[in-house]
Amino acid sequence: MAMWLKNGMSFNENGQLVRTHIKIEHGNIAAIHHEQLFEANGEDVIDVGGKLIAPGLIDVHVHLREPGGEAKETIETGTLAAAKGGFTTVAAMPNTNPVPDRKEQMEWLARRIQETAHVRVLPYASITLGQKGEELTDFAALKEAGAFAFTDDGVGVQSAGMMFEAMKRAAALDMAIVAHCEDDTLKNGGAVHDGDFARRYGIAGIPSVCEAVHIARDVLLAEATGCHYHVCHISTKESVRVVRDAKRAGICVTAEVTPHHLLLCDEDIPRLDANYKMNPPLRSRADREALIEGLLDGTIDFIATDHAPHTAAEKAKGMEAAPFGIVGLETAFPLLYTHFVKKNVFTLKQLVDWLTIKPAQCFGLQTGRLEVGAPADITVIDLETEEPIDPETFASKGNNTPFAGWRCQGWPVMTFVGGTLVWEKGRA
């Protein structure tokens, strides 16, 4: 049955925020009316009361932990967290147990997603068997089984020869290589950034060059192979410079940045709180400023959360022993809206684009836009109500966030996937 969302606000084709009414039918957007009145002909009508109607948000960097890490997260809980955060499409990283490195595992994952996911899930396949960096997977078979792209995220592919061959195979299949960039010989056994915080507490630090050197190697390999090479969670000013230079040279490279690297630097870490431990680590203030500049000038293409849930017991082990990672799906939009749009650093249109159409364009997705005929993946967002971030209310199994207590506006209140309401604020 058809349905209308009425009295919302969305961006028209000229980038202006205007009153909007959207008709949803057969899972797609059937009509969009701006300003003018419309008459419902027996269809259900939801009055969104002037709230923002945005395309469903897209996150291409999420750890759902299943299979093997169900104590931290499952496909069901992680995708419910995604829906609560306004995300209608997420891409699931392959650092699970077992790793989706064979056709049979990819097929199992596809079935599990079909059975339990609340939103669309795009599964990554690994570049190497077991993510061990020793032997390449069967890219063609994994693509046939539904792989979204190839990555060994969580570790960097250390062998240049291995990465070169991976890029050649990916390019032949018109698939992307998505890279976690760390040179293991430069990691220094670090738990935080190699900066003032590390020196103050006597903790081994991860130097910026560890990431930038790896990216520099890979962009040259991408140039040689013609592969689409995507940089995960870029974090340093040197890395931004390398990607900027590569784009100017016409190399097919894209990059993402996380909300936490835009919002925080190592100066913000209070004592030895492991909820501030992630990889890459929070870098310097100069790095943070370079990331913001890189996002604004197009060097960095979009924002992705790197949602990485862990148990409370794991994070209680302290800064050096606790695992890397924080959750992000339920806090990304409110944090970015409150601390960048409300402060006139970003425009609302820029923020929405970085979380929707930009990742969709980078990876050739059909979602991420409000257009007649497009899938009705839609998020309704309340830009006015201010609430604190409360980890105890998270849908995710993980509550490992450095943003507890931060007061934010810009909270999603309804999320639709293919025209179906999958989450609504206040509804059990």
Swiss-Prot record:
Substrate binds at H63, L64, R65, N95, N279, H310, F324, G325. This is Dihydroorotase. PROSITE patterns: DIHYDROOROTASE_1, DIHYDROOROTASE_2. Pfam families: Amidohydro_1 (PF01979). Keywords: Hydrolase, Metal-binding, Pyrimidine biosynthesis, Zinc. Binds 2 Zn(2+) ions per subunit. Catalyzes the reversible cyclization of carbamoyl aspartate to dihydroorotate. CDD domains: DHOase_IIa (cd01317). Gene3D superfamilies: Metal-dependent hydrolases, Urease, subunit C, domain 1. Its cofactor is Zn(2+). Zn(2+) 1 binds at H61, H63, D153, D306. Belongs to the metallo-dependent hydrolases superfamily. DHOase family. Class I DHOase subfamily. GO terms for cellular component: cytoplasm. The active site is at D306. Zn(2+) 2 binds at D153, H180, H233. Pathway: Pyrimidine metabolism; UMP biosynthesis via de novo pathway; (S)-dihydroorotate from bicarbonate: step 3/3. It catalyses: (S)-dihydroorotate + H2O = N-carbamoyl-L-aspartate + H(+). GO terms for molecular function: allantoinase activity; dihydroorotase activity; zinc ion binding. Signal peptide: none annotated. Its EC number is 3.5.2.3. The keyword Zinc applies. It comes from Geobacillus thermodenitrificans (strain NG80-2).
